[in-house]
Amino acid sequence: MWPPSGAVRNLALVLARSQRARTCSGVERVSYTQGQSPEPRTREYFYYVDHQGQLFLDDSKMKNFITCFKDLQFLVTFFSRLRPNHSGRYEASFPFLSLCGRERNFLRCEDRPVVFTHLLASDSESPRLSYCGGGEALAIPFEPARLLPLAANGRLYHPAPERAGGVGLVRSALAFELSACFEYGPSSPTVPSHVHWQGRRIALTMDLAPLLPAAPPP
């Protein structure tokens, strides 16, 4: 079972839709019941992460700061075990899966499964980007040269753990702060060519672009 988050999830289940099988949006229409047991001693749960990096039960009627998961230990466990869903179940509608023993936790996302929410500064080491409410426990080195501003949807992306898709979305508030560091060339007024960071002028590599073939709507 998950770390002492049972009470957290139980509360979220109360706030979610009834436990009857329902249809959710996705590439295909699929029915499920939260906590269903397709096999003995196996449970399945279904989650959703929005563009702010907030995690919800997928069938929550209302998705806002009140209803999102906030338990740090739960979030760290959930996202540190996130992998592409190759289980043969719900792969099209829930492309990511977080396993905990015999518990399957399926995830779909508004944009990307990893959403960077905070830039953690430190006097002794390079800054790190924290994602999905995990603080220091869910953080990776900040690579300013690999920031990817996408003109198609006005969003900003950064490398993410490979197991979680390799590309993460930068939350809008943080993206706005970082945008002040961008330099735009005369030939490309909508897409920056360089970023100014810690006294350096750094060319943007744009190497993440091939990993985002279809930009989600703004």
From Swiss-Prot:
Pfam families membership: DUF4505
Signal peptide (from-to): none
InterPro entries to which the protein is assigned, alphabetical: DUF4505
Domain of life the protein comes from: Eukaryota
Any Gene Ontology CC annotation: mitochondrion
Family: Belongs to the UPF0598 family.
PANTHER family (alphabetical): UPF0598 PROTEIN C8ORF82
Protein name: UPF0598 protein C8orf82 homolog
Protein species of origin: Mus musculus (Mouse)
